[in-house]
Amino acid sequence: MYNKHHKTLKLHIKKGDTVQVLSGNYRKKQGTVLKVFPKTYRAIVEGVHIVSKHKKPTAKNPQGTIEKVEAPIHISNLMLIESATSRPTRIGRKLDEEGKLQRYSKKTGEFIKNG
């Protein structure tokens, strides 16, 4: 899964992107990326992959609780939603007019604004 000697790849998903889940129990569900974990190739998506987390009793909460939280999902199961068309698109990278490497939509060819 994670090898500390292996170089991590650039990911097509960034924090703040709107994505759609491609496979699994949450297939076709959309959400915003809350956090990305590049070393393990996973991301937390808002409203997707909800799990129950058991909290121990504390002085503040002597009963203890069961909370519903989002768990990470593998990046290969996510596809970026293009803001212009609201449809999933594949991502590529190419140089823009300023010579900077930018993400672009392979469907429309337009550059994707970061963040």
Curated annotation (Swiss-Prot):
Keywords: Ribonucleoprotein, Ribosomal protein, RNA-binding, rRNA-binding
Family annotation (Gene3D superfamilies): 2.30.30.30
GO cellular component, one term: ribosome
Pfam assignment, any one: ribosomal_L24
GO MF term (any one): rRNA binding
BP terms from Gene Ontology: translation
InterPro entries hit by this protein: KOW (IPR005824), Rib_uL2_dom2 (IPR014722), Ribosomal_uL24 (IPR003256), Ribosomal_uL24_CS (IPR005825), Ribosomal_uL24_KOW (IPR041988), Translation_prot_SH3-like_sf (IPR008991)
HAMAP family: Ribosomal_uL24_B (MF_01326_B)
PANTHER family membership: MITOCHONDRIAL RIBOSOMAL PROTEIN L24 (PTHR12903)
Self-association and partners: Part of the 50S ribosomal subunit.
UniProt function note: One of two assembly initiator proteins, it binds directly to the 5'-end of the 23S rRNA, where it nucleates assembly of the 50S subunit.
Sequence similarity: Belongs to the universal ribosomal protein uL24 family.
Identification of the protein by name: Large ribosomal subunit protein uL24
Gene: rplX
